[in-house]
């Protein structure tokens, strides 16, 4: 299935049902009191994370989604049925953004997590609500309020513990194949990887982490060059980044300049992403002799002024990959647990705008009929006996 990580949709919550103007009609009580019921609340629109989904492709073909409208109230104090909520299932890791305000509404990072994105309209009031000691035959009702309408931008960001960074052909896909069961395409030309790949690494029994491989970055990626820039967002949730450097590039490029270019693109794209823990992984050690290898490693570390962790591996021969995986799982376990944010917060209803300009009179009733109303229906009945 085609991997789609962005989609724009329009969601419309259901309008609230209108109240009813009705009067009780019974035998011997031709002019009974008001019995118009309230309308039903409109259905709301929710997003729900589902681990059985892994792409947003369905939303590219179906962009408009509307919840059910609340039913109108009826006579005999019958309240209208509330509109059914609409639940849209999205992949775990989806972020919802209001396209008009560019406000982030929340992230769905766990299976079954649900987020309210459009609140249904509030119900209208029937004429029973307006009866009083001075108004025995109210003819007024209120309409239901409109449901919320939003244009949403959905962004799928993969959930991974470790993210791979590097130039094209740095060996990222080979590395993920060597440490997990993921099988991304590997070839000797740039941009072999066109979409992100995930793999699960199990260095020890009962301990594992998820690793993400994205298309390679090139200089100018933050300005739109290459493929990797549109996938950098998938690394935002990673807890540590592995910066893979090809120690002997086939095109003769300078690995130091390539590494600097990657760091520069990270800082341009997102300072937050650039501040994440980042380890330097020098790949393809099997292509050089031991003396030349160590000399190049020292030169790269010195020129980059690297202060963090440095590992030397051969992803193709799986040399050093097991040690690196063990270090990663220990580091991830030592990090504090990330706080979970409850996105299913109640939306505060705007009472100031409630029923604004929605009061209306039922045209089926004429105020001139007030004289026919039986006031005794609500008074004490007096029975005279001989």
Curated annotation (Swiss-Prot):
InterPro entries assigned: G_OBG (IPR031167), GTP-bd (IPR006073), GTP-bd_Obg/CgtA (IPR014100), GTP1-OBG_CS (IPR006074), GTP1_OBG_dom (IPR006169), GTP1_OBG_dom_sf (IPR036726), OBG_GTPase (IPR045086), P-loop_NTPase (IPR027417)
Enzyme Commission (EC) number: 3.6.5.-
Listed GO biological process terms: ribosome biogenesis
Subcellular location(s) per record: Cytoplasm
UniProt: Mg(2+) binding residues: 173, 193
Domain Obg: 1-159
Cofactor(s) it depends on: Mg(2+)
Composition bias, Acidic residues: 360-375
Signal sequence, renumbered to the chain: none
Chain sites annotated for binding GTP: 166-173, 191-195, 213-216, 283-286, 314-316
Domain OBG-type G positions: 160-333
Pfam families for the chain: GTP1_OBG, MMR_HSR1
Similarity comment: family membership: Belongs to the TRAFAC class OBG-HflX-like GTPase superfamily. OBG GTPase family.
Cross-referenced HAMAP family: GTPase_Obg
PANTHER family named in the record: DEVELOPMENTALLY REGULATED GTP-BINDING PROTEIN-RELATED, MITOCHONDRIAL RIBOSOME-ASSOCIATED GTPASE 2
Subunit structure, as described in the record: Monomer.
Name by which UniProt lists this protein: GTPase Obg
Natural source organism: Shewanella sediminis (strain HAW-EB3)
Gene: obg
